[in-house]
Design a protein with these regions (language model features):
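Phosphate/pyrophosphate-binding catalytic cores of soluble transferases and nucleic-acid-acting enzymes
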Residues: 1-316
Length: 316
């Protein structure tokens, strides 16, 4: 792999909704093409959040290096700007070793910002704005705050879960502080050309019911893998684990821990939240240009992905 300054490094990305088989495909391609994985998942960066984030297990890695996993404690903040900087450094190291960087994950904003080379300018939050937004959240409620975000920046609202209060407030904070949408900032900060030569493989199913069945099965497996105890740790530290406390896979069990609900309805709520999240992921990726979509249920999906990857690398 050419590491010269004048030639763009090739980067492969495997994207798609939750439970679509991204991890297994990414590992298979890494084995075949000498790759290393960069996780593009906003929650797998955190230590100890393993079951609820469907973090790759040592057995599933098959010896392939995985980067961007288990780096931070759950009480440490991590933004898309942080990810873009981290992924850029990892890409440089992996390409420098003569290996193929393979971005694997379902956080569309991370994938797009990295592959498109978005530059994030530091912005100073006006004094008192963050506290004001927090007070408004308490007074008006999360539905009103999300409705405001939908009104001022509908593109950002599509990418953010209505119950992810942290991200909703951050997006509103950016808008009120700068007068610009996050989506506008992203467009304004795009470089003249993309920094990498990339192939993006997307996984989806012909029938949405196939994906939903896989999601339901995954949740059942998570329950067998002691998700409840992991969620309880997040509940016990919810005042400091602010990002995790808003994450799908954990917050659905809070009513159970508070003695306000039986367990079974919480499990069903998690399945529904995961299905809704998958729909939002697909909406995001369908708006991204240049994705080569593959039928995740096809028996030869790995062969199709390998053929496309081989053709992509041959063009370099």
């Amino acid at each position: 792999m050419d590491g010269s300054c004048n030639k763009k490094h090739p980067v492969l990305a495997v994207v798609g909704p939750t439970a679509s088989g991204k991890t297994a495909l990414g590992v298979a391609l890494a084995e075949q093409f000498g790759g290393e994985i960069i996780s593009a998942d906003s929650m797998q960066i955190y230590k100890g959040l393993d079951v609820g984030t469907a973090k790759v297990t040592p057995e599933e890695t098959r010896g392939i290096p995985h980067h961007g996993v288990d780096i931070l404690q759950p009480d440490e903040p991590f933004s898309v700007a942080d990810f873009t900087a981290l992924a850029g450094a990892l890409e440089h190291e992996i390409s420098g070793r003569g290996h193929l960087p393979i971005l694997v994950g379902g956080t569309g904003l991370y994938v797009q910002s990295f592959l498109y080379g978005v530059r994030f300018a530091a912005e100073k939050t006006p004094d008192g704005l963050r506290e004001q937004l927090a007070a408004e959240l308490t007074q008006k409620g999360p539905e009103a705050m999300y409705a405001e975000l939908q009104a001022v920046d509908p593109e950002a609202a599509v990418a953010i879960h209505p119950n992810n209060h942290v991200r909703v407030l951050r997006a509103l904070e950016h808008y009120r502080a700068t007068g610009k949408k996050l989506s506008e900032q992203k467009a304004d900060s795009l470089p003249p050309e993309k920094p990498y030569r990339s192939l993006i493989l997307g996984l989806d199913f012909p029938e949405r019911a196939q994906l939903y069945c896989r999601i339901d099965l995954r949740v059942d497996q998570m329950m067998e893998q002691d998700l409840l105890n992991e969620a309880k740790r997040v509940w016990e530290h919810r005042d400091t684990y602010k990002t995790a406390a808003q994450a799908i896979g954990y917050k659905e069990f809070f009513p159970y821990f508070a003695g306000e609900s039986a367990l079974a309805p919480c499990v069903e709520k998690l399945k529904q939240a995961s299905r809704n999240y998958a729909k939002r992921q697909l909406t995001w990726f369908r708006h991204m240009e240049g994705i080569c979509w593959l039928d995740a249920s096809a028996p030869d999906v790995r062969e199709q992905a390998a053929r496309l990857t081989n053709e992509f690398l041959a063009k370099g």
